[in-house]
Amino acid sequence: MTRRTPPRPVDVEQLFPEVAPLRRQAVRLHPRAGSPSWRDSSVGGPLRWPDREPWPLCPEHRGSPMAPIVQLYAADALGVVEFPPACDLLQVLWCPRAHDGRWVLPEVHWRAAGAVGTVREAPPLPAGTPYGHVPKPCVVHPELITEYPSWDLPYPLWDALEPRFAQVEAETGWDYQYHLSTAPGTKLGGYPGWGQDPQWPDCSGCGKPMDHLLTVASSEADAAWTPFEDEGVRYESADLMLGDMGGIYLFECRSCPGRPVKDRFGS
């Protein structure tokens, strides 16, 4: 089944042409409880991990195995993120235990699916893994959407547009920040779903601002962003509980070799 986000009831760029140059494409993954295999893109599902490679272990927790979080084949990225040359598979894992100043410790791997060969089964997670830090297995339903900055809107522009934001909300009931700009949920590309001031990282190598790669979110949608197919339907998703219903935001530098990664937490 596909998932389709209802179109916004107003033309954002017509009302606020100043945000048009800041538009970004994102892919809402719409994870829903299921039984994916390693042949599928998934959230919390089995990874197409080569048997010849050791399973990643956390360096801070006595070699505790990392948990599979997201697997995405290039076909399901819908062109939003350019994969490294010869790669068509993105895999994200993390150690779900608390770390010094961080909620989780993630790793990002790019690989060629056809070169994997025999697939290694993930080791079981240790007892005491925090509840809500590892997603339940979900199939995904990739959907291409357009986003505009919310918390990432530059302060001078926000101040200039705020009277029009207020006018549109008064006339339509639609708030720019929560209804018209940035989609909630687990997604590729676009803007992070910040709940407060942005913590956009710079690359330690080149010093440039990093690109948003992926948001892994506790909540998938509110009423305004619920797909048509889920309206009035009770559904199960990844059952994550990251802090106070927050999210983990992964960033990468696409200019430096190896595409180094940093993460941020937001609630």
Describe each model-derived feature in a short phrase.
Residues 1-267:
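Preference for intrinsically disordered or flexible, low-complexity segments
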